[in-house]
């Protein structure tokens, strides 16, 4: 996938964007991440009402963040907003096969346009002003551009909770790559994580040369102390269970990866011979 590979022209554009960005944030008002909280509920096919446990979790975040602007983005609200502000992105949004892809894609669009913090609906808030609470004291006066917590190294950047300053080049890059990444990857789970989800974002992260703009929240601080999972994973399919077991068993996964490489090499040689007959 292109967003996992180095591209000299893309790298130059990122550097130009960062030069412009850094010239704009000298204003003291830009030192803080906007106090805007985004959550998303999309059920475009079944038109389901939001689950009670998600509503309870959302209420906990609202009650602890009365000084934040809060928006629950629904399918219809997103379409109306995109029509006004990002009409060119509406076909990309509508062409996704799954709602989870739409949710992931909109996380990046909303954080780019508004800035603030995005939180999945299955996360219950346990602290006030999460943006400040995630940061050490020495980073609270001049907050980092982007706050993330990483998944497994080399595989994903978690997207369940993220914070960012408005119009940041990192999320501009992410949004710009969504259309090209929207492909079918043969499995439901792989399609979601590679086309718009955590693995997609990790590819963008690898492309982005300015790693000093990120702050990584330790999972030991985040979970249990600042937020609590109330049971989500509503998007997981049968293949998710298989992939999870595969990843947890290192010996089995290494063997399967090796076997897959051998099979692909054999297929490649067969096709190459057939081509020159």
Set out the residue ranges of the language-model regions.
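Glycosyltransferase-associated regions of secretory-pathway enzymes
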Residues: 1-103, 121-277
